[in-house]
């Protein structure tokens, strides 16, 4: 894996896809000027943040590609080793009930590009429900080291095909909660083998959701 680091960049996803040659490429930056989140949401820079993207050829993936957002989120949460750092299906990273990061997966021709955005420190978040992992700024070297370890962890899971949904679910806040999705509400029951969310509607019907447009209610 090749790594390139920036103090600021337009967009790590676009740069990673543009610069990809053959080996997996990791781009990491402390800030983005034109970042984007899931569903084309704008990227908001915290006082100290990490924006990183890992791009690789699809041919190295020999398991269900819809698991990649789950794998990417779990890879970060597992390396930080803070019991209050959790996952919300399918792509949010939560700390003490505040959203501190998220995952964005995009495909471009033969490439898969995984983006990760994390708020390390944010004294006064200007977004409802947003937060940061740390109460003070961290050494920039730690942030870039976290990015590299995150990238290597993902590639190791892909190479060895040993990503565990049980481990993922141990960090998940969503199961057992009432969730709202575009067509209604239901109770989150399980994560299927393809990474989709199984919910039970008030009428008892079981549905499998793949859309990230859900919100936890209770």
What are these regions (language model features)?
Residues 60-87, 95-218:
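Long, positively charged amphipathic alpha-helical accessory segments at protein N-termini or as interdomain linkers
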Residues 1-78:
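N-terminal lobe of the biotin/lipoate ligase/transferase fold
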Residues 1, 21-29, 86-89, 151-154, ...:
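N-terminal start-of-chain detector that recognizes signal peptides
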């Amino acid at each position: 894996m090749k790594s390139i680091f920036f103090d600021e960049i337009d967009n790590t996803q676009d740069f990673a896809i543009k610069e990809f040659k053959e080996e997996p490429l990791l781009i990491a930056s402390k800030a983005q000027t034109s970042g984007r989140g899931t569903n084309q949401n704008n990227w908001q820079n915290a006082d100290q943040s990490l924006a990183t993207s890992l791009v690789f050829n699809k041919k190295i993936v020999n398991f269900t590609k819809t698991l990649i957002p789950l794998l990417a989120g779990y890879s970060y949460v597992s390396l930080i080793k803070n019991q209050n750092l959790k996952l919300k299906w399918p792509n949010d990273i939560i700390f003490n009930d505040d959203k501190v990061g998220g995952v964005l997966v995009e495909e471009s021709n033969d490439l898969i590009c995984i983006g990760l955005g994390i708020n390390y420190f944010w004294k006064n978040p200007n977004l409802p429900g947003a937060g940061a992992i740390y109460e003070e700024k961290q050494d920039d070297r730690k942030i870039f080291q976290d990015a590299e370890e995150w990238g290597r962890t993902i590639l190791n899971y892909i190479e060895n095909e040993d990503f565990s949904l049980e481990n993922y679910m141990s960090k998940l806040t969503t199961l057992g909660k009432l969730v709202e999705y575009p067509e209604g509400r239901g109770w989150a029951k399980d994560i299927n083998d393809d990474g989709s969310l199984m919910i039970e509607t008030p009428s008892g019907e079981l549905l499998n959701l793949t859309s990230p447009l859900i919100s936890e209610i209770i």
